[in-house]
């Protein structure tokens, strides 16, 4: 796909940064879009700007702060603690987030003549978010194509990878140290290895430890 262009939904976290490095290897031109939705870890906006500036990637930033007016969760309401709800979902789940992100990304992509959209959602080793499921992404892809009469292709390179395999992918792309030290996954806004306690950090560390152990025994 070296003669194609792509738009990466980008947060500056482990997953989207790994997707960005893969996109840079696979496509002739790559742009990214980041969303400001009043997230607890607002530092991710600065991290996204720094990473894209360093890599020389065109960066679009869109304001979706209205999300905090529509739904209550601990990712946009800083007064809430991060817990697990009765339905088993972390309190950090933001209703409609990926639906809106991908819909706005598609509008932007079409306007720029891009049909490939890349997102780092994953169903294998995740927090149970329903909008990270493969069935949702495929359904939305069809809906967006019909809604805008445009041949979008939503790519989910991490969908069936666990966190250990995601670290392995970053390593194969020559980006292991960059992803480990420069990205922000932590819900408490701590770059790199994070706080170690929030759900995002726990998943990241579990995968990192497993990958390092595997490499050491290879």
Curated annotation (Swiss-Prot):
Keywords assigned by UniProt?
Answer: ATP-binding, Ligase, Metal-binding, Nucleotide-binding, Queuosine biosynthesis, Zinc
Pathway per its UniProt entry is: Purine metabolism; 7-cyano-7-deazaguanine biosynthesis
InterPro entries in the record: QueC, Rossmann-like_a/b/a_fold
Q: Which GO terms describe its molecular function?
A: ATP binding; ligase activity, forming carbon-nitrogen bonds; zinc ion binding
Where is ATP bound in this sequence?
10-20
Q: What's the catalysed reaction?
A: 7-carboxy-7-deazaguanine + NH4(+) + ATP = 7-cyano-7-deazaguanine + ADP + phosphate + H2O + H(+)
Gene Ontology BP annotations? queuosine biosynthetic process
- Report the enzyme's class at the first EC level: ligase
> Per its UniProt record, what Pfam families does this chain match?
QueC
* The record's free-text note on cofactor binding: Binds 1 zinc ion per subunit.
Q: Does the keyword Nucleotide-binding apply?
A: yes
Task: Detail which positions bind Zn(2+).
Answer: 186, 195, 198, 201
Similarity comment: Belongs to the QueC family.
Looking up PANTHER family in the UniProt record yields: 7-CYANO-7-DEAZAGUANINE SYNTHASE
Protein's UniProt name: 7-cyano-7-deazaguanine synthase
Gene that this sequence comes from = queC
């Amino acid at each position: 796909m070296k003669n194609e262009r792509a738009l990466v939904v980008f947060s500056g976290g482990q997953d989207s940064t790994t997707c960005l490095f893969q996109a840079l290897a696979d496509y002739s031109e790559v742009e990214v879009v980041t969303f400001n939705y009043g997230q607890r870890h607002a530092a991710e906006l600065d991290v996204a700007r720094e990473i894209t500036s360093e890599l020389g990637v065109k960066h679009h930033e869109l304001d979706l702060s209205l999300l905090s007016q529509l739904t209550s969760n601990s990712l946009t309401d800083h007064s809430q603690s991060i817990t697990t709800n009765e339905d088993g979902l972390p309190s950090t789940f933001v209703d409609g987030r990926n639906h809106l992100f991908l819909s706005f990304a598609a509008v932007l992509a079409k306007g720029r003549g891009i049909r490939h959209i890349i997102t780092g959602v994953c169903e294998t080793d995740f927090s149970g978010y329903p909008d990270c499921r493969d069935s949702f992404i495929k359904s939305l892809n069809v809906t967006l194509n019909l809604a805008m009469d445009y041949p979008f292709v939503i790519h989910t390179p991490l969908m069936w990878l666990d966190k250990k395999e995601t670290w392995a992918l970053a390593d194969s792309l020559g980006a292991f140290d960059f992803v480990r030290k420069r990205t922000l996954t932590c819900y408490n806004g701590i770059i790199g290895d994070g706080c170690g306690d929030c759900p995002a950090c726990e998943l990241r560390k579990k995968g990192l430890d497993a990958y390092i152990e595997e490499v050491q025994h290879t």
